[in-house]
């Protein structure tokens, strides 16, 4: 049995490093233009993407470059220039959706494998065969694909790798093919600037044909109903079925625009789940409780195990987002000596430490605070909040940009958190 690859989102260089340190075998990300994540100033530049690739390769891990937008004719020259620039960075694969872009990429950089984006909506063996004949090495399956169908595709095309999403946001539309945002905001999802209009609350009205009066059809508390809002995908409870099928080469986590803690926690838990499967020690209830520490829209196992018409639990009509069970109070700096405050933090309060895979945490007590272990979990208590500039406080809020000293160094990219609900 081949070990499955765990693939995590990398929205920027920091998240790339976090995901790799928390156990990802590979990460995916892109540089504006055609990567379906155009967030000015918040994503990679060519320089930082190259730095990320070099960082990953030094760890013997991989980086896949997303070039999965659907270009218009007016963009083809820019696309070609972009492909040449991305090829020079030497990513481990291109993730592409459009057949024409696949052919162009294969011409420009025949040595770089092509992975087919989920945006291509592959659901059957016939479509998979077409893209395989185009030279595609791996298909990122449509979220609507069932595991049984994935097994059939693998049987027909044993040399074709299949990748599935196991966690993250889901579109109301068919694998992201949506124009709601384009129509309402002028922001085109398939060019990387979706405004997430499906997450808004809407009100139903009916029009009286006799007098034109508009009447509200559904009465709800608040301002409306989230009629388009899909729950978040969570397949942590189905790792055994997925890996036992021997059809899946990679498990993918969605979320390039989500928080650093999200990148860390999802990678941490799915890394643990995959490793536990191979050691026959699966703990699905633990994975579920830990993933609930993240903000989410409610969870569903999507369509991999059951068809859409067999279920009525993929939508959340009540709210577009809910808080997780835990609040992140601090992010440890890369040198491990300080943390950046992300939420109100006080003295004499125990904060759980979430650290990268295999990171060592040494207990200590001094005048700043203590680091200790209790029931296999590590905690930090601050006796005083001492800023980098030596200012002393009893409480610090997220608006304070000064770094806070730790009693002793903690592993880079660790997090401090507290439980906010049971």
From Swiss-Prot:
Keyword Transmembrane helix belongs to the record: no
Signal sequence coordinates: 1-58
Keywords for the protein's UniProt record, in alphabetical order: Hydrolase, Protease, Signal, tRNA processing
PROSITE patterns in alphabetical order: PEPTIDASE_U32 (PS01276)
GO terms for MF: peptidase activity
Enzyme Commission number, as recorded: 3.4.-.-
One GO biological process term: proteolysis
Function as written in the Swiss-Prot or TrEMBL entry: Involved in prephenate-dependent formation of 5-hydroxyuridine (ho5U) modification at position 34 in tRNAs, the first step in 5-carboxymethoxyuridine (cmo5U) biosynthesis.
Family, similarity comment: Belongs to the peptidase U32 family.
Annotated protein name in UniProt: tRNA hydroxylation protein P
Gene: trhP
